Structures are given as C-alpha cells and as structure tokens.
A protein has these predicted regions:
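A glycine-rich beta-to-alpha transition motif near the start of alpha/beta enzyme domains, typified by
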Residues: 1-112, 142, 152-161
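Short, solvent-exposed secondary-structure boundary/capping segments
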Residues: 113-120
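Ligand-binding beta-strand-loop-alpha-helix segment within the catalytic cores
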Residues: 123
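Anionic-ligand binding region
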Residues: 126-141, 149-161
Length: 161
C-alpha cells in the first residue's frame, strides 16, 4: 500500500489513493486508526482517501479522524490535498476541484509551497454571551465540514499603541 504524508499549518495527514477500488471502503476507518496512531505507526491527525470523482471534480475525498470517525472535510487537509493533486498531476487544470461530503472544495497553487482553497460559506449566528468570565462580543458558528466556532473578545480588538 502506497501512501503520502503531508503537513499543513501544524496538522499532519496521510493520503491514500484508491482510484482502482483495491481498498474496500469498509476498511477506511480501521486504516485511519492504524495509520494515524502516534508513536506506534505513521502518526497523523487524519486520513484522506482519494476516490474517482462522482460529480465532475478531479477526485472525491473521504476524511477520517485519527480515531477512525468521519468528518465531511478539513480545511488544512484540503490544502494538503490540493498540493498532492498538483504534484501527482491529478488535477485537470490550474485549479484543483475536490468533491467532499461538505460540497466542492476548490484550490489553487499560489506559490511553490502555498495553496489557497475556497470553502463553503459558513452559517453565522451573532450572540452576546459570557463564557467562564470572559464577555464575548461575537460568536461565529460555521460548518465548513467540521464544526468550528470563533470567539472574539475585547482582547482581540485592534488597539492603537
């Protein structure tokens, strides 16, 4: 079995190409848990399995966390996957088009080691909440594949020096 390991913004990912279907999808979760196990294997934050596209993309990606659970998509992983597609000649043009359960993710090489991706637009909920004594002025709940929350506090506001 051939695989590649990439690092993006501090996250490590293992990439498997399964374009020929030689690996049964039922094995993906167990492979993720085995390959991503730190200190006893390759070690990674997640496994991305590439399959033939189903809806006009360059490939379809299935993402598995290190414990074998699934996620719709991962932004840092998608950037690594764009690099992989570029380096392996898997993209049909200058833009890499990756099908994910969260929707189509597109990426473009902007420098030798830099890739920019376009994610789905997150949903936004503006709230004023207090969390453990910190008053938050803004909370964004987005789901670009894996649920995320961004909290800006008074400390995050720009200040003049």
């Amino acid at each position: 079995m051939h695989f590649w390991k990439y690092c993006g913004a501090g996250n490590d990912f293992v990439i498997l190409e399964n374009f020929d279907g030689s690996i049964a999808p039922e094995r993906y979760a167990a492979l993720a848990a085995a390959l991503c196990r730190e200190h006893f294997s390759v070690g990674a934050d997640g496994l991305m399995v590439l399959e033939p596209p189903a809806q006009g993309g360059d490939c379809r990606m299935r993402f598995y966390n290190r414990d074998g659970s699934t996620a719709e998509m991962c932004g840092n992983g998608a950037r690594c996957l764009c690099r992989h597609c570029h380096d392996r000649g898997l993209a049909s043009g200058p833009v890499q088009r990756i099908e994910t359960p969260a929707g189509l993710v597109t990426g473009r090489r902007i420098a030798a080691d830099r890739y920019r991706i376009r994610l789905n637009r997150p949903s936004v909920v503006r709230l004023h909440v207090e969390a453990e004594g910190v008053r938050c002025a803004y909370l964004e709940l987005g789901e670009p594949g894996i649920p995320h929350a961004v909290v800006l506090t008074e400390l995050d506001r720009p200040r003049a020096e």
